[in-house]
Amino acid sequence: MPDDGRAAGHVSGLQVAQANGLVEARYRFDLTGYARAVDERTTVLQRGSGVLSLLSGWLLEPRGYDRAPTIDIRMTTGPGLVFATGLPKVGDAWRLSGTTIRFAGYTALGRLNLQEIAVPLPGSLRPGQPQGQGVLRVAILDGVSTVGQAELLDWVRRTAEAETHYWQGFTARQMLLGLVPVGTRRGVGYGRTVLGGGPTVMVEVGAAVDPR
């Protein structure tokens, strides 16, 4: 079962098969049902048809190893749907290595606004250092107007630029920032960072955006 025990009731059709030294598990997971039942900003939240959830909430984890195994995640999404994490991309897979699923951070799934912002690699703006680009993925869940989403993205870009100039490069090679609208809030509210296999950040923002 996924690491969060509350997820067990949302797993169905679990089948485990062994062949040629490999074990394959197939199952269905009701992500919307899980999000509605838990609805915690530290675990999983849903706005419209988009979900921000810890990877440990819905992904099965191999057990019985002396050290955490490397896990490659390949995701196929339907038309208009997206998937993103803070994990590095290796070919067509998102790779988790050196840590367990419990510390893998947030994932963004479903119908939401996903944008990628190119950022300089950590330390790459220092004299004599090799140049390179990383990526800041920004996932905005439903609840903010189109104009408001543009204002939020501009705010994120300007903040990332300020951090880049201060640290002479961005603070991570890749990062996922999930922005979760809260109708009762003004401005920026609660935020949470999960490092692990790839840094992810969840920030609650007011549904009404004030560009000031």
Feature locations, PLM:
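A surface-exposed beta-strand-loop module
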Residues: M1-T43
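Solvent-exposed beta-hairpin/edge-strand motifs
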Residues: M1-V11, T70-K89
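C-terminal beta-strand-rich structural cap/linker in extracellular carbohydrate-active enzymes
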Residues: A17-R28, A93-E116
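Edge strands and adjacent loops of beta-rich recognition modules
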Residues: L45-G57, T100-G132
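Juxtacatalytic substrate-recognition/specificity segment
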Residues: P120-R212
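Zn2+-dependent metallopeptidase catalytic core
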Residues: R26, D30, L59, A68-A84, ...
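Glycine/proline-rich low-complexity spacer/linker segments in large multi-domain proteins
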Residues: D30-A68
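Extracytoplasmic
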Residues: G9-V11, N20-L22, A68-T70, Q133, ...
